[in-house]
Amino acid sequence: MFLAEPPRTRYDVNFRLAGIPVRVHPLFWLMTVILVATQDTKPVDVLMWVVAVFISILVHELGHAFLIRYYGWRPRVILYSLGGLAAYEPTWHRMLPQIIISFAGPAAGFLLAGIVVAAILASGHGVHIDWEALFPMPIRFDRYASRNLTVFVYDMLEINILWGVLNLLPIYPLDGGKISQEVLNHLNPAEGIKQSLMVSIFTAGGMAVVMFAKLGDLYAAIFFVLFAVMNYQMLQQYNDRFGGRGW
């Protein structure tokens, strides 16, 4: 999700998956725990959450990485702090491949959620959509005898569906923001970058209001405020460099 590749540490976990190098920065584990540590959760629930986040973000980034490799580049995956990164050094740039690469991450998560739903059905448990409770996760399923398994399955669905949808919002540097930037820059090379940053600011600001005022989710609201501020700063830097009306 975020763009800057963190420096290596001696506490990194390194491995390869399908020929793609993967590095897990220690801050990944810390921030994943912090996301639920403030809630009244049992230690086993925290463990289920960490495992679900690790699997889901890894699959998301591998979705990007497989398409990067398909287009002839050499990807590497880094999991760190608040997300992950499929890093590579592009040797050419075209709109459609970049859009496909950006969409491949959320698509991989949706596919994983579909596999989880299929596994629920295969185990003889019912699944339905609660249209009156779309947030944070509209899919409901019959509980398993094991509470831990039920928690893990719920976490997997929430992460891969909810985070996947939010990640497609036109907010840079989310995947949806990268897609909107590619489209707007293609339609208007002179102003596309600036327009995409403005879209990011308004979308992030609107989502912050919705998350806090309508859904009461302070942490999500803070994240969207940070996105709005970051894009505002990028817009100011863009105007300073290339000229344009400041805000």
Residue ranges: model-predicted function:
Residues 1-247:
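Hydrophobic transmembrane alpha-helices and their immediate loop junctions
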